[in-house]
Design a protein with these regions (language model features):
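N-terminal Rossmann NAD(P)H-binding glycine-rich loop of SDR-like oxidoreductase domains
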Residues: 13-36
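NAD(P)H-binding glycine-rich loop region in Rossmannoid oxidoreductase-like domains
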Residues: 60-113
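Conserved Rossmann-fold NAD(P)-dependent oxidoreductase catalytic core, especially the SDR/UDP-sugar
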Residues: 95, 116-163
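Short alpha-helix in the Rossmann-fold core of NAD(P)-dependent oxidoreductases
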Residues: 108-115, 119-122, 134, 169-170, ...
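Catalytic helix-loop patch of NAD(P)-dependent Rossmann-fold dehydrogenases
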Residues: 109, 141-186, 208-211
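Alpha-helical substrate-binding/gating segment
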Residues: 196, 201-204, 213-251
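Mid/C-terminal beta-alpha module of Rossmann-like enzyme folds, strongest
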Residues: 229-294, 299-300, 310, 316-393
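Functional cation/ligand-contacting sites centered on basic and imidazole/sulfhydryl donors
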Residues: 378-503
Length: 503
């Protein structure tokens, strides 16, 4: 009788398959889901490394609703085990920074293969038992959004920055999952995640961000809550089959300068002006924006804790997981007594081989200089801190035209209206979900992918990166590109830019 009751209780639970549970967002999501043992059965897929086994062993003992599948996202059979019988798939896993920044081939292999495996496994399920799929995309898909275009929304052009193979794989994986024929899906594009370990990041990539660039950050706790909330049965039907931006709200809309100030203050370090040169930072070709549609996801899922941002940074600095040295520095502010010593360490990082911005300048690495500064002349024209504008970015959004009547449901648009949208992208709509770009490539894509997701021709999609040329034939894309680039620019970045990065 007891076994029958247990089976009945289990039958009522939602079965979740989560990838990426040992990563920052995935772990937060796992811990949030495990708080509701009466509602969920949780399966996770994790590589059988010693580190993962040590991390997950205590949880496996504490939580009877947790089932660990030891395997690999790039192996279809392992993914199929997790997907089979699940009610919802949360695909969070893949290679991310900092590993992804140094391993382009491995990043492409892992992230794209994982998306293909998840899609194949979901489509292999009986149609009446096909799980919902939530894909975690990235703000990196949207590329460089400098002023005055630092406000954006889902449906804006996909525009992955040159050298950003991670962003490229996230865009490709999003297309694979959301345009595959899966019945019920959602793509949630993650921003920068605030979590305690970010306070100890020390990497030359820290200088790849423009000082006046922006991000609408998401806290790790909000991100974890989001993953649990999207699994609830009360999520309405109209939520699904759409694209969303993840952020913790207006309080977390920061310029990169404001972020540096908050971070450095939290760990007791001097201000940016005392420990960095302004020209160590790039002036373009990163990613990040504030969200015009940022509250849309919150209105559906109610995942934000709305902790004041200064308070949140103070909390991070007190996190038990931080190294003792950082906690000591945060408490004593001792580094503020030795700004020159801190600057020496930062100078060393800016001059790091291959990825240091000053290494590019010293060795005249022209593709990097053109991508991240425009030209050597533009680099030399960067003002010092005394003359640098670090004021808060404009709070007035500039709305990009998506080329169709957005008051209408995209599924109700006529062929003529779709052709108008295609013409705005330099192409044609040929009917039956078939499109043609300005270069004559013909491709299949759903109207949701094109109009709500901001994707376009897969044959024109990098690499090579040739956005200067795309802007000349695609008015939709030109809205984003032309205001930020000189018309004479004609940069093309092929796969050769990654030569020598990895074996």
């Amino acid at each position: 009788m007891k076994n029958e009751v247990n089976r009945a209780q289990r039958a009522k639970k939602t079965c979740i398959f989560l990838t990426g549970a040992t990563g920052t967002m995935g772990y937060a999501g796992m811990m949030e889901i495990l708080r509701y043992p009466d509602q969920y059965e949780l399966r996770i897929l994790a590589r059988p490394s010693q580190k993962n086994k040590e991390l997950l062993a205590p949880l496996n003992l504490q939580h009877s609703t947790l089932n660990i599948i030891w395997g690999d996202l790039t192996k279809y059979e392992d993914v199929l085990k997790g997907v089979t019988g699940a009610d919802i798939v949360l695909h969070v896993g893949g290679m991310v920074s900092p590993q992804a920044d140094y391993r382009p081939k491995a990043t492409r292999r892992t992230n794209i293969t994982a998306a293909e495996n998840v899609t194949k496994a979901v489509l292999a399920q009986p149609e009446d038992h096909q799980p919902k799929v939530v894909y975690i995309g990235s703000v990196a898909q949207m590329g460089d959004r400098r002023e005055p275009l630092h406000w954006g929304r889902a449906g804006d052009p996909i525009c992955v920055s040159a050298y950003d193979h991670y962003g490229l794989t996230k865009a490709q994986a999003e297309r694979i999952i959301t345009d595959s024929g899966i019945k019920t899906w959602a793509s949630l594009r993650q921003s920068g995640i605030l979590y305690p370990a970010i306070l100890k990041n020390y990497d030359p990539i820290m200088f790849h961000v423009p000082i006046r660039g922006v991000l609408e950050w998401a806290t790790v706790e909000d991100s974890g809550r989001l993953l649990e909330r999207v699994c609830r049965p009360e999520v309405p039907a109209e939520f699904w089959n759409n694209y969303y931006n993840i952020g913790s709200g207006a309080e977390y809309r920061l310029s990169n300068y404001e972020f540096e100030c908050l971070l450095l203050d939290a760990i007791g370090c001097p201000k940016p002006e005392q420990i960095f040169n302004a020209n160590w930072f790039t002036t373009r070709n990163f990613h990040g924006m504030w969200y015009i549609d940022g509250d849309k996801l919150e209105n559906y899922l109610h995942f934000r804790a709305n902790v004041p941002v200064k308070e949140y940074f103070a909390r991070m600095a007190k996190a038990p997981s931080l190294p003792a040295g950082i906690k000591f520095a945060a408490k004593t502010h001792i580094a503020k007594l030795f700004p020159h010593c801190v600057k020496l360490a930062m100078r060393f990082m800016a001059n790091s081989k291959e990825h240091g911005t000053q290494w590019w300048i010293k060795h005249n690495i022209e593709p990097r200089i053109h991508a991240y500064y425009g030209s050597l002349e533009e680099y030399k024209a960067i003002p010092d801190w005394k003359h640098f504008d670090v004021s808060h970015n404009s709070e007035t959004p500039v709305l990009l035209d998506h080329g169709y009547d957005e008051s209408k449901d995209v599924d109700s648009l006529t062929d003529a209206e779709l052709n108008k949208a295609a013409a705005f992208r330099g192409g044609k709509y040929l009917g039956n979900d078939t499109w043609q770009c300005a270069q004559g490539h013909t491709f299949k894509a759903s109207r949701r992918l094109i109009l709500l997701g901001g994707h376009w021709c897969p044959d024109c999609f990098p690499m090579p990166w040739a956005w200067d040329r795309e802007a000349k034939r695609n008015p939709f894309f030109a809205q984003l590109w032309a205001p930020l680039h000189d018309p004479s620019e004609d940069n093309v970045y092929g796969p050769e830019i990654f030569d020598g990065w990895e074996k």
